[in-house]
């Protein structure tokens, strides 16, 4: 432990042992050893007899002096690191490191050596290897030193990052299955800035620092994991990490990430939960500005747009825009703003396919989505307005009007075959549920049994739907409503999808008192586990080996 002292010409325990072994007068030898190796300052030496009279052990005295000197030395090292020209101060620190590194394994002096290394932008490679080879030293060194180790050792960096990524995914999935059922406090309620203060994002930000190479490694981990698991929460983390570095004004990274300004603009939209005309044009400008030969940037842009918070904002804006078009008596194809929202939505939803195929082209917009599906959706809005107006008429003027109960066959076909149509359709369902529009909900529920990629049974949609259904609490006392919701929709996926059962249970925990006892008993029986369960969509794990794979290159280009 004290071997390093000999290199500095300082006596240690072995020297004392040898002295006592060879001496003829041990007491004199001890006194001489104390004199030679004790505190040499006259002002302190004179205090020793006084302390002896008070029974203060010499060890306690020397330890106190040592601690004080070490603190002063740490302060001085930090001062050297911030004074004068860079070249001069780094030279001083390198000299100090050379003299002190032999003491790095001494617990009492280790903080000084670590402090010196922390302030060096480039620690000598030989010393980095010695630190990396010793687990105790590696754990003790500052993150500034670890960055220098990680940038040339992706496997080790992957080992550090992997638990954080697993933790992040678990936190997101736990939020989706939160026992709280509320329209005001749901998965999308926290603001972007609040989310970026989360433990995982802050730790990753600290680990990356201003190191472009490490930032690029994290992006490669996220892309690979997204490709392997299809878990969209990795897309969220990709955007949050970039904006966390933006908050800290880390220009070294933000200035070289081609997605920075696009993500910054989109972040403002997510904060407002709406894409206004001005920001829509800014986003369009970024997409149109992708030059020939730089199409790979679309890969990262699509991943950022695949973030559930971005999809949520774009979908809400689309539904709101459709309602405005009804009032303006305009068709979807006549609205450039709506077409841009659809373009962004299509790019986000096509992220996985783009990364998988490595074909970096914007997905082609289905013409029928704009010319047939969206007008049909607008006709549903008109049906609601017509029915509501009729209900408000005086009895003598009211015509016998019944609310439409069927869906056009083409509409359900769109939900089954086109992802874009399905996403917009599901957000329209969320909209009418939030408006407490029971008639419209019951009309649309049968169309949700079979949707593109079972999107109607995804955790995000069911999380939002169950929260909105809390507004219709009184309707759960009605047999027809419960049958349509549970038997006609939710239970059609049970027990095939375990996640659906969990969301149904979340709903019943809050509303079971409103449900008729006979119906509640039937639901309990239907929800009993059978042992034949698929993995929920939130069951994805972070594959360990992925983070240890060497990248094909290391630079801040999207791919």
Task: Identify the role of each PLM range.
Residues 1-559:
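Very long, low-complexity or repeat-rich scaffold/adaptor subunits
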């Amino acid at each position: 432990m004290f071997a390093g002292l000999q290199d500095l010409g300082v006596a240690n325990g072995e020297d004392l042992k040898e002295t006592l072994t060879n001496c003829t007068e041990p007491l004199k030898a001890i006194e001489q050893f104390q004199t030679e190796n004790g505190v040499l300052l006259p002002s302190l030496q004179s205090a020793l007899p006084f302390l002896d009279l008070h029974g203060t052990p010499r060890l306690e005295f020397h330890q106190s002096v040592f601690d004080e000197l070490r603190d002063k030395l740490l302060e001085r090292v930090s001062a050297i690191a911030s004074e004068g020209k860079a070249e001069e101060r780094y030279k001083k620190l390198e000299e100090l490191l050379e003299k002190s590194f032999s003491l790095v394994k001494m617990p009492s002096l280790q903080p000084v050596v670590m402090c010196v290394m922390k302030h060096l932008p480039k620690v000598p490679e030989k010393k980095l290897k010695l630190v990396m080879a010793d687990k105790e030293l590696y754990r003790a060194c500052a993150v500034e030193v670890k960055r220098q180790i990680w940038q040339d050792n992706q496997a080790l960096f992957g080992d550090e990052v992997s638990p954080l990524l697993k933790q992040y995914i678990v936190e997101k999935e736990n939020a989706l299955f939160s026992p709280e059922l509320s329209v005001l406090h749901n998965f999308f309620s926290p603001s972007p800035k609040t989310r970026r203060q989360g433990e995982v994002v802050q730790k990753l930000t600290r680990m990356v620092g201003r190191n472009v190479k490490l930032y690029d490694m994290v992006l490669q981990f996220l892309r690979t994991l997204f490709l392997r698991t299809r878990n969209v929460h990795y897309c969220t983390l990709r955007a949050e990490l970039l904006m966390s570095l933006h908050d800290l004004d880390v220009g070294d990274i933000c200035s070289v990430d081609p997605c920075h300004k696009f993500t910054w603009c989109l972040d403002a939209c997510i904060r407002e939960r709406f894409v206004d005309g001005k920001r829509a044009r800014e986003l369009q400008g970024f997409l149109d500005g992708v030059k020939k030969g730089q199409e790979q940037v679309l890969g990262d842009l699509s991943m950022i747009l695949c973030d559930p918070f971005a999809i949520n904002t774009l979908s809400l804006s689309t539904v709101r825009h459709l309602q405005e078009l009804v009032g303006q008596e305009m068709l979807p194809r006549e609205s450039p703003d709506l077409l841009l929202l659809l373009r962004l939505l299509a790019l986000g939803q096509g992220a996985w396919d783009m990364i998988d195929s490595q074909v970096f082209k914007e997905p082609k917009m289905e013409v029928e989505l704009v010319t047939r599906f969206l007008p049909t959706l607008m006709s549903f809005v008109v049906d609601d307005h017509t029915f509501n107006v009729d209900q408000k008429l005086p009895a003598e003027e009211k015509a016998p009007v019944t609310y439409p109960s069927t869906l056009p066959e083409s509409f359900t076909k769109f939900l089954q075959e086109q992802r874009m149509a399905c996403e917009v359709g599901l957000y329209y369902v969320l909209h009418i549920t939030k408006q407490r529009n029971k008639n419209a909900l019951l009309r649309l529920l049968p169309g949700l049994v079979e949707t593109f990629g079972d999107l109607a049974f995804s955790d995000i949609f069911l999380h939002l739907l169950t929260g909105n259904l809390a507004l219709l609490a009184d309707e759960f006392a009605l047999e027809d409503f419960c049958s349509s919701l549970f038997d006609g929709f939710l239970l059609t996926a049970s027990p095939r999808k375990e996640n659906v059962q969990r969301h149904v249970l979340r709903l019943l925990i809050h509303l079971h008192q409103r449900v008729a006892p006979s119906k509640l008993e039937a639901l309990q029986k239907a929800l009993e586990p059978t042992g034949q369960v698929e993995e929920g969509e939130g069951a994805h794990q972070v594959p360990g080996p992925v983070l240890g794979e060497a990248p094909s290159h290391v630079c801040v280009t999207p791919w």
